[in-house]
Amino acid sequence: MDQREAETLQYYLKEYGQQAEVFANQLELMENGRMEALAAIEALQSLVEGGDGTVLLQIGGGASLRAKIVEPDKVLLNIGSDVIVEKPNAAAVEYLKDRITELEASQKKVAEALDKLRNQMNEIAKRLEQGYAQAQAAAGGSHAGHAHAHGEDEDEE
C-alpha cells in the first residue's frame, strides 16, 4: 500500500466516522421522541381513567405548577410544521401510537445504515492495519534478517 492509498483510506475512515456520529445522534433523537410519545400516552390514559384531573405543569427552569385539566378529552397535537390539531383523547392516543410505530421503523432503518457504515469502517481499518504491517515488515526486513544471521552464527559456535 502506498502513501496515497493510506491517506485516502484514512480520509474515508474519518468521513464515515462523522456519518456514524450523525446516525447515532439521529437514533438518540428518535428514541427521545419515542419515549416522549409513550409518556404522553400514559398521561392521556391516566386522565381518562379517573382522578380529579390535577397534573403537574412544568413551566421551565425546574419549576412546576399544579394545574387542573378542564377538558381531558380535548387534546391539542402538534402534527408537524407547527400545525396544531384538536383530537379526542382516544384519537390522540392512537395518533401517538402510530407515531411510535413510524419512529421504530425509522430507528430500524437508521440502525441498519449505521451497522453497514461501521462494517465498512472496520474493513477500512483492517486494510490500513495490513498496509502498515506490510510497510513495517518491508522496512524492518533487512534488520530482522541481520539479527537472525547473528543468532545463527552464535548457535554454530
Question: Language model features by range: what are they?
Answer:
Residues 1-79, 83-157:
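Intrinsically disordered, low-complexity regulatory regions in eukaryotic proteins
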